[in-house]
């Protein structure tokens, strides 16, 4: 992404360099980086943020000669307990969906009176144990930011 500061002080961002700008009609997007800088176009730095953070309003960094988004901490309206409960609910849904993939095996074996393969039973037990471990970890978080930043597993 690239941006420029307009005469009125506002910063305009572009996903790609415009083809025309000012007195350059066509080919503006082919100018070199240093040529673009003469027109006030500089790179935009977008930092990687955590769930507990958000990007602030884009600003010019004189020090680095780039436009950047400052990182700000999010304010959470839920209580710590509510955030934990919500995160745990999502966790259980994720693990429930993974366990559900083998439910048909359990049901089939029960209906037919077969013994379920130990690999299936072990895998299901491991999922339940892992879910309980992660639930304990979530409950151990002491700040809203730590709960928000706790990454849930993905089985995709």
Model-derived features: where do they sit?
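A preference for well-ordered globular domain cores
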Residues: 1-156
